[in-house]
Amino acid sequence: MPQLSTTTRVRHAASEMFDLVADVERYPEFVPLCQSLDVRQRSTDGGKHVIVADMTVAYKLIRQTFTSRVTLDRAKLEILVEYLEGPFRSLNNHWTFRPVDEHACDVDFFISYEFRSRALGLLMGAMFDAAFRRFAGAFEGRADQVYGTRAA
């Protein structure tokens, strides 16, 4: 099962990065391969906000839509993404934002996935790997656009 785990230090507050990643409806504007995202449901569970959303990813002529539950834990600065339905056998994704100081944080990103179809995995696997490796940079770039850049 392919997986990727990265830690990136960014020049933005942990709360800012949490808010940016939590704003799933903006993903089509900057997340690699994300063509659309539709929120199905919003709720609160034990002080955590929960979003159920459909994300459509597209690459050339291939389009796949999958549904995930996104749990936003602002108190812990953690975001958990749980796969519900779509072309994957499994998909697990989580983010943790660890403050370094008031203007910087470490962003921990983890994702593992396995396509249900071997053929789809062969067709899209390498492209997904490349896209996921660009995720941290895409979010950092978006943070620079939204919050401005800060000197190191």
Give the residues covered by each predicted segment:
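Hydrophobic ligand-binding cavity/cleft-lining segments
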Residues: 1-48, 102, 149-152
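Short, surface-exposed coil-to-beta transition loops
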Residues: 3-5, 63-67, 90-93
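Hydrophobic pocket/interface hotspot
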Residues: 17-18, 27, 53, 70, ...
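Glycine-rich portal/gate segments that line the openings of hydrophobic small-molecule binding cavities
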Residues: 39-85, 138-142, 150
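Beta-strand/loop substructures that line and gate deep hydrophobic ligand-binding cavities in soluble
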Residues: 80-134
